[in-house]
């Protein structure tokens, strides 16, 4: 083997392996201290890009879960208020039935009306004050809002809430009353047919035909109407006037009356009536109030059902988001996180190689000194 002084190849080789071992140890220490095996693009450019996308998706999923929980909270606040509104309407219905009884005097009906008015005011107060984060929920201003329940744009769910004020059309309907009352001696003669045509809430054209019998009185006619249709409700006031009420929850638009009996009864024009207009100081008003409140209860129940479905949907959405997020983070971990068992093994190897390279380098540096012995 040649002995050189100017070029110590053995030392250079040992130095190269020493540097390589030092770099390996430094990289292992970086991975072990950071917890990530990809700390820069030079470690794994493709893996870093995939990891960043997965991280963005995971953060989006976390925010989507928060949004969904906020949506559930809004629905719970609104439904709680609707529950109390339902209790108020049911109490108003009880009072209407009580006032419709013939055992009550005018003064007693006026007293009942005072409670009905107070309940109506509370119904409106609940509608006006129920809010979430400053947003009114039940006074008609909420409208339709979207809830982002996905990690990407376009993954939104819409929630609509209408007004629960007692003066809205959803809390009432149209009332039709005979222009003239029938006394107790009135009965159906040879004109026995009454037809009612309307469009129901589902958009279907309906025609209700009442076949009365000669000798039937006005109360029996109201019974026939109620027995053949859930969409319209009939009652008779103390003045003998037949009145028909069609809730906006059952009927779209107006009811048209025809048939030879319709002419004899003589229905007047449609009149818009809501819970706000309830007047239980008369038998006729009390009976109509029951029909009006039934429609209002259906309106509230319909909104509550929508909120219940909304909450259930969001609960399932949250479960799905959590499952997706778990798998996304697991994938990201496999790509980016440090395998401590593997990395500690690699660091130990680098440390041993570094120590060995250092020892060999020290010996290699002594090789040129052999030339001095030849000169001696």
From Swiss-Prot:
GO cellular component, one term: extracellular region
Keywords: Bacterial flagellum, Coiled coil, Secreted
Endpoints of the signal sequence: none
Keyword Coiled coil: yes
Record's keyword annotation contains Coiled coil: yes
Cell location: Secreted; Bacterial flagellum
Descriptive protein name: Polar flagellin A
Species name: Vibrio parahaemolyticus serotype O3:K6 (strain RIMD 2210633)
Gene that encodes the chain: flaA
